[in-house]
């Protein structure tokens, strides 16, 4: 099993798809990496040679921020927004939508389950 950036790639998938299992690599970036490495995107992971795997690993480590480093950078960006107290930071802190979506209805994913208020008894 090929292990790149701390992720075990699924053996039965095409390399182009398998690389997307790494956080920070999508389909277009996967194609870009394979072109640089000179690997056929239709090759299955189990059919990759050790040389090809090491070439892919080297390209990803050198040129792209993936997995832990990328997660850390995103977390630091959000923390910075919170620390400077800007609108986006406040929305992150309150757990509300950040990009201007409506909140009177919807926004349940961001706000969590409804907190129902009991009706006043007579």
From Swiss-Prot:
One Gene Ontology term, aspect cellular component: small ribosomal subunit
Biased composition (Basic residues): 101-122
Location of the region described as Disordered in the Swiss-Prot/TrEMBL record: 97-122
GO biological process, one term: translation
GO MF: rRNA binding; structural constituent of ribosome; tRNA binding
Source organism, top-level taxon: Bacteria
InterPro entries, per database record: Rbsml_uS13_C, Ribosomal_uS13, Ribosomal_uS13-like_H2TH, Ribosomal_uS13_bac-type, Ribosomal_uS13_CS
Key word Acetylation present: no
Xref: Gene3D superfamilies: 1.10.8.50, 30s ribosomal protein s13, domain 2
Keywords recorded for this protein, A-Z: Ribonucleoprotein, Ribosomal protein, RNA-binding, rRNA-binding, tRNA-binding
Quaternary structure note: Part of the 30S ribosomal subunit. Forms a loose heterodimer with protein S19. Forms two bridges to the 50S subunit in the 70S ribosome.
HAMAP family recorded: Ribosomal_uS13
Role played: Located at the top of the head of the 30S subunit, it contacts several helices of the 16S rRNA. In the 70S ribosome it contacts the 23S rRNA (bridge B1a) and protein L5 of the 50S subunit (bridge B1b), connecting the 2 subunits; these bridges are implicated in subunit movement. Contacts the tRNAs in the A and P-sites.
UniProt record similarity statement: Belongs to the universal ribosomal protein uS13 family.
NCBIfam families: uS13_bact
Name listed for the protein in its UniProt record: Small ribosomal subunit protein uS13
Gene encoding the protein: rpsM
